[in-house]
Amino acid sequence: MGRNWSKKSRRTAVGAVRRSGAPLALTLAVSLLGLTACGGDGDGGSDSPSASGSGSEQPPQGPDRLGPAPSAVPSVRQWKAVRGPGWQRTDRTRVVPGSDSLRDEAKLLADELKVPVAKGPSRTGDIELKRGEDGGKSPGGKVNGGPESYRLVSSDGKITITGGGDAGVFYGTRTLLQTWRAQGRFAEGTVADAPDRPQRGFSLDIARKNFSADWIKARIREMGDLKLNQLQLHLSDDQAFRVESETHPEIVSDPHLTKAQVRDIVGLAASRHITVIPEIDSPGHLGAVLKAHPELQLRSASGATPRGAIDISKPAAAKLVDELLVEFADLFPGKWAHAGGDEYQALMTENPEQTYPGLAKKAREEFGDKATVQDLATAWLNDRASTLDKQGKIPQVWNDGMHRGGVVKPNKPREVAYWTGREAGERQPSEYLKEGWKIVNLNDEYLYYVLGQPNNFTYPTGRRIYEEWTPAVVRGTDPVPDKWAGRDRILGGRFAVWGDLADAQTTGQVARGIRLPLAATAQKLWDPQRPERSWDDFVKLVDKVD
């Protein structure tokens, strides 16, 4: 991860419909509705996003004029403008939820626009929220996003947002809110929108660098506006363990998040349809745990103690880590959990069996004479994934915890978070995809913001992500073949912040530094096609919608 590469140097390097190489369902939807697509959207950088704004007022839209496309980040995928007055917020504007289940979505939008929530039939000036086939299954709704799809109709001074699910309704409100911030109105017309990838997120290392609960919540609000839906928290590493633990209070560092703060974070994320994914990395990156449990420290034949490496030959090591995984499964109720698996120092030596004879002996005892330390490490990660599976979680692991060959094979179900092509064995993304694994893209060439820029890392730019990267670019700068690039194989991606040199930036500098890259990542996960807006125009738009 941006993590310890004291490892090898990683770098080597209204009218016609827009046809964007999208799936057949999208093309059919466009053909049926005659929707036109709008361009890309913008980026910026601040410590916390603004709650609402008055927008940049546009000239009144006359009945004979076509209004501008929505201003949203990420950009809407289909837009059809028609002649009409459009919508503006007035003193009579209300948000009208079509059911009690949408009341939370209605209240959030109403608070942002500073208007009331109301029951009953909608009227001119209102914003109506509802769920139904128009959002999830109609030609204009289900582009390919299911519950995250939505249809927004601006007609005769009223807005109607129909989502395939609650998330789709929420995303429709984001498009409306951002457009109002940028334009002060919403033109007459219809939006049909849905994400290209189901997993779209941000990964944050809170172990090496402490980030306050308020800072994390500010990012969640920012993520919600960007239609991102996952927040991965790297909870523990060699430097610290940053969350309160009742099963093992002895490992917890100061400062740390209390469980009450975590519940608050998880609750805010849920209100923005964001799943918080906890990561307790093992069998490496456990230095903070081992400080409290030196008896579990891995030792080499010469007595050396590789930092953060737990002795996976000891049953007590597995017991401790499993207890933490089970404890935090309840605290983080989402369907994913991350088991780590990267950079285990025992596998980063030239001859693991000679350097760590205790591990080699245990491997042979458990798996036969041909077994190696790699097999023992694979079995360790299998067991941790199994623990998470029993808790109802989908396990995710780093790609350098997935090894070629060996007596013991990685088990399923699990998803592979691909971050590096410089691990021992250097397995290409295509190798994982050929084997049937599903990948989440955290390509360190584009998506790693490593504090202090150690080991040839450089701070990523939003421009490179916006102009070059797509979910299919998993390693380096080259995409995987099209036959493996679909959303059923590459599930999405996450932009990641790692705190290798924690004091290199303040938390405020981090917030400002990641603002544009995070917006660009959101754009390309929502629609991976080359944006129609230039980068400079994208930046201007981000500033307007924030």
State the predicted function of each range:
Residues 2-34, 38-167, 175-176, 182-190, ...:
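Acidic, contiguous N-terminal accessory segments
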Residues 95, 165, 202, 223, ...:
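Conserved, mostly hydrophobic/aromatic
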Residues 145-318, 326-336, 352, 501:
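Feature activates predominantly on carbohydrate-active enzymes
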Residues 199-203, 230-232, 273-277, 336-338, ...:
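Structural preference for beta-strand elements that scaffold enzyme active sites
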Residues 207, 236-240, 279-285, 342-344, ...:
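Active-site beta-loop-alpha junctions enriched in small/polar residues
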Residues 287-290, 348-357, 407, 450-458, ...:
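Histidine/acidic-residue-rich catalytic or RNA/ligand-binding cores of hydrolases
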Residues 307-413, 419, 424, 429:
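Active-site neighborhood of glycoside hydrolase catalytic domains
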Residues 395-400, 409-546:
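Flexible, acidic glycine-rich loops studded with aromatic residues
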